[in-house]
């Protein structure tokens, strides 16, 4: 929201699966409420809509869900009055973009999906000890993932679990660099502090570092090179899109379309830019 090169068209509050420990009950409404709070803090209320996503998950790979967010994605993708590239940044499930594709398949070559989620690819990375096969964001709506991977030709940039887990920010950095940066910095630091408390209540320990795993959504869209725009400072490969199984694992598919899978991310640029923008905002300079 603080990136001057980006024209934010909408923010969509999405669901959490039933039974998810983070689910507050009316999950979509709470997501919209949380987003509106951030939008208000950055002084952008009314500049773009904050919309509700679907209230539920896909039951099969052919039937779309309905929501204001889904319809907005379709309308935005089908615009013919702009040459700007359109990115759909997904930091949770793939529910909205999956249903948008089912309702209007022509959006596939008119946007790029940047998704934080999915299991490690066996040929690229090992799975962390104790990590479940069913990665958290995919677990929110596995069928949506199957729609995008197995039944669409959507242009997909994937940041799988091994990659987003590397976006570590220490508690000391949180307290000394983020928390002092005005109302917004204090709010973000407090929200991350709540995670540590919640983990402790479950008998665990959050340790000294937390993965700010959704941050690559900014890195890979707003922070591209000025010439021949691309994500030059982060490593990625093109991979034949595997078949996504119901258990969250992949089955190789040599005939799959090419998808971009990210590995090593430019944390220096990503977190340096985050702190710099929060400093500018706190000083009233953006």
Regions flagged by a language model, labelled:
Residues 47, 110, 215:
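A residue-level signal for beta-strand positions that form part of recognition/binding surfaces
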Residues 1-29, 55, 59-172:
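Active-site histidine-anchored catalytic micro-motif
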Residues 35-40, 100-102, 144-146, 204-205:
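Intrinsically disordered, low-complexity boundary segments flanking structured domains
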Residues 1-10, 136-139, 155-286:
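Conformational coupling and interaction surfaces
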Residues 24-81, 241, 245-246, 250-269, ...:
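Metal-dependent C-N hydrolase catalytic cores
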């Amino acid at each position: 929201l603080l990136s001057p090169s980006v024209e934010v068209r909408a923010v969509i509050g999405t669901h959490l699966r039933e039974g998810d420990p983070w689910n507050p009950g009316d999950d979509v409404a709470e997501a919209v409420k949380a987003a509106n709070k951030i939008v208000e803090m950055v002084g952008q209320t009314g500049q773009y809509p904050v919309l509700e996503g679907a209230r539920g998950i896909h039951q099969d790979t052919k039937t779309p869900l309905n929501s204001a967010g889904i319809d907005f994605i379709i309308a935005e993708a089908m615009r013919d009055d702009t040459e700007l590239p359109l990115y759909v940044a997904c930091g949770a499930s793939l529910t909205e973009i999956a249903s948008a594709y089912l309702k209007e398949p022509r959006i596939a070559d008119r946007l790029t999906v940047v998704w934080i989620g999915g299991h490690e690819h066996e040929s690229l990375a090992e799975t962390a000890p104790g990590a479940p096969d069913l990665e958290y964001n995919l677990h929110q709506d596995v069928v949506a993932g199957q729609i995008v991977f197995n039944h669409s030709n959507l242009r997909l940039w994937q940041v799988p679990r091994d990659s987003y887990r590397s976006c570590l920010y220490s508690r000391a950095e949180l307290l000394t660099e983020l928390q002092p940066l005005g109302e917004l910095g204090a709010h973000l630091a407090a929200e991350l502090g709540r995670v540590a408390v919640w983990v402790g209540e479950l008998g665990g320990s959050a340790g000294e570092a937390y993965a700010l795993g959704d941050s690559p959504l900014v890195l890979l869209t707003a922070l591209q090179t000025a010439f021949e725009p691309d994500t030059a400072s982060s490593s990625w490969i093109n991979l034949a899109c595997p078949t996504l199984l119901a258990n969250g694992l992949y089955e190789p598919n040599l005939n799959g379309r090419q998808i971009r899978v990210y590995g090593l991310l430019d944390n220096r640029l990503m977190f340096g830019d985050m702190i710099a923008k929060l400093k500018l905002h706190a000083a009233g300079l953006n």
